[in-house]
Amino acid sequence: MSKVVVLNDKLEKAGELDLPSKYAEVNPHNLYLYVKSYLASLRANTAHTKGRSDVSGGGKKPWRQKGRGGARAGSTRTNVWVGGAVAFGPTNERNYFQKVNKKQKRLALERALADKAAKGALFTADSLAIESGKTKDANAVIKKLGVKDALIVKDLLDEKTLLAYRNLANCYVVDVTEVNAYLVSVFNAVIIEKSALESITKEG
């Protein structure tokens, strides 16, 4: 069974909690599909080439059809001409959206949490608030745990905690309503407030 490491006020291990057993039984393909959809939604649709109807010029036939010994040509803007159109090139009309059902999103999150717990990289504490709002205090939390990077999940994200973590390159803080399977998967460790963890497991 997947275990969540419980931390005390000093961020030391104080015990373990069990994740629901069904989390580890979720097909990992659900996680793959969600991450694929999430990354596709981040793609910037900027690559664009001009087709025959987009390029300027080329309305006049460059030379007569017959009698001069060369290949026939009807326009100087076909894809075989320098300065002409591009055949089958990318356009900015493409839609990269990939639909993922609400249930599948939920299953993906459950699997991601189970994978983190199996690696001993899922932690929970009563409070993760940084009341001082200082980055050095937030950095001390990460150093204390000895992890390379971490996702911090708050039940209710306050401004001071956001300011404290915002300037850390190896840390990202989110409200529990914004957590998703991709964020859980991409960080080496996940630290969730106990009340936030309860709301996540309750939904499932």
Curated annotation (Swiss-Prot):
Keyword Transmembrane recorded: no
Pfam families linked: Ribosomal_L4 (PF00573)
The protein's role, per its UniProt record: One of the primary rRNA binding proteins, this protein initially binds near the 5'-end of the 23S rRNA. It is important during the early stages of 50S assembly. It makes multiple contacts with different domains of the 23S rRNA in the assembled 50S subunit and ribosome.
Upper lineage: Bacteria, Pseudomonadati, Campylobacterota, Epsilonproteobacteria, Campylobacterales
Highest taxon of the lineage: Bacteria
InterPro entries in the record: Ribosomal_uL4, Ribosomal_uL4-like, Ribosomal_uL4_dom_sf
One annotated GO biological process: translation
Organism per entry: Campylobacter jejuni subsp. jejuni serotype O:23/36 (strain 81-176)
PANTHER family, alphabetized: 50S RIBOSOMAL PROTEIN L4 (PTHR10746), LARGE RIBOSOMAL SUBUNIT PROTEIN UL4M (PTHR10746:SF6)
Signal peptide: none
An example Gene Ontology molecular-function term: rRNA binding
Subunit structure: Part of the 50S ribosomal subunit.
Stretches the record annotates as Disordered: 49-75
Keywords: Ribonucleoprotein, Ribosomal protein, RNA-binding, rRNA-binding
Name of this chain's protein: Large ribosomal subunit protein uL4
